[in-house]
Every structure is written in C-alpha cells, then in structure tokens.
Swiss-Prot record:
The active site is at residue 60. GO terms for cellular component: cytoplasm. SUPFAM superfamilies: S-adenosyl-L-methionine-dependent methyltransferases. HAMAP family: PIMT. It comes from Pseudomonas putida (strain ATCC 47054 / DSM 6125 / CFBP 8728 / NCIMB 11950 / KT2440). This is Protein-L-isoaspartate O-methyltransferase. Belongs to the methyltransferase superfamily. L-isoaspartyl/D-aspartyl protein methyltransferase family. Keywords: Cytoplasm, Methyltransferase, S-adenosyl-L-methionine, Transferase. The keyword Cytoplasm applies. It comes from the Bacteria.
Length: 212
C-alpha cells in the first residue's frame, strides 16, 4: 500500500481538488507519509485523510498540507518559515523541501522527539526545533517571511503577527475548537495586515504551554 502507484493516486486526488503548484506536488509525491504514522495505520498513509498520532493530535489531511504550503509559497520562494505545531513532522518535512530554513515549535515533547528522528532519517537538516508554547512563536529568531500554524486558534495570536516580516505571509486556521473554523491568509503590508478567508476547515486546538 506504499507503492508508487498508491502515491500517484494521492497526487491525482490533490490535483482534482485544486492543488496546482508542481513543486508542492512533487515534494508530496516523494515524501514517505507512511513513516509519519503508526505502523498499524501505514496502509492508510496515502489516503487523503487526517490520521491520529496520539496525544489527541493528528497528522493533517494531505490536501490541507498541500493547500497551506501552496498558499504560503503563492508570492514566491521563502527563506525563513516558522511552523507552529510540529506534530508528526510531516508538514515540517514538506516545508523543509520547499523553503530554505524551517523553525518548528511543538509543545508535546514526545511528538517533537519522534519528528526529529524522522527528519534525520530523511536527511532533512534545514529544520531547527523548539519545545515550547506555539502561541508565543519564536521571537528570538524573528522575523519570518512565512508562518504556518497547524492548529486552530480562537483568534490570531498577536505574538505571531509581531513576528511576521514586512511582506510576510501567515496561513492559520481561526475559530472555536470543535465548531466552525476558517482558514485565513494574512499578509503583512506597509500599513498593517490584509486578511483573506479561504474556506471552512477543522483542526485540533492550539493550546498554551509546553507538555512533556
């Protein structure tokens, strides 16, 4: 079930759903998603669906990974991206092959440790990890010209807005956990921020504080 044919079916599905960035599609095609899920779920790794990874977290649906990556890159290449919510490390691995440097924050230590191991296995070495509160971002290394948030916040954290470079782009789900949520694209412009609502989504909540 992890054959090239299985992966190609996923790519075909993503194209049918509107993903058109060939770089994003190529990276998803060659990234072994089955390495980012438990062995018992490996046979479902190339389905276009979110899957549980423990600790009440999920590996995001491939379409959402592709869509958010595509939105982030819509205005051109990025050299410095902040990811909030490492999770399984799958989105991290996709970003690491699309941008120059990724800075990834995860509050659940055991998930972060597993993600690190997977990225080393894939020889992806342009990622720096931080165990901590994603709501705070990573101010010491700011600003970032891209920020991607993989959990839903009731409102856009001001700390993340502050860490977005001029012209930078943030993709973030916003809304109450378990209720109607919207994916938003935020761009830092000369005199403030522009916001574009991109459609309904469902994500796990963005929580405060690190967790061992």
């Amino acid at each position: 079930m992890t054959s090239q044919r299985t992966r190609e079916r996923l790519i075909q599905r993503l194209c049918e759903e509107g993903v058109s960035n060939t770089k994003v599609l190529d990276v998803i095609r060659r990234t072994p998603r089955h390495l980012f899920v438990d062995e018992a779920l490996a046979h479902r790794a190339y389905e276009d669906t979110a899957l549980p990874i423990g600790h009440n977290q999920t590996i995001s649906q491939p379409f959402m990974v592709a869509h958010m990556s595509e939105l982030l890159l819509e205005a051109g290449p990025l050299d410095k991206v902040l990811e909030i919510g490492t999770g399984s490390g799958y989105q991290t691995a996709i970003l690491a092959q699309l941008v120059e440097r990724v800075f990834s924050v995860e509050r659940i230590k055991v998930l972060q440790d597993r993600a690190k191991e997977r990225l080393v296995e894939l020889n992806l070495r342009n990622v720096v990890f931080r165990w901590g509160d994603g709501c705070e971002g990573w101010p010491a290394l700011a600003p970032y010209n891209g920020i991607i948030v993989t959990a839903v916040a009731p409102e856009v954290p001001q700390a993340l807005l502050d860490q977005l470079a001029p012209g930078g782009r943030m993709v973030i789900p916003v809304g109450p956990a378990g209720e109607a949520q919207q994916l938003m694209l935020i761009v830092r412009e000369e005199h403030g921020f522009s916001r574009r609502v991109l459609g309904a989504v469902r994500f796990v909540p963005l929580l405060n504080g690190p967790l061992a």
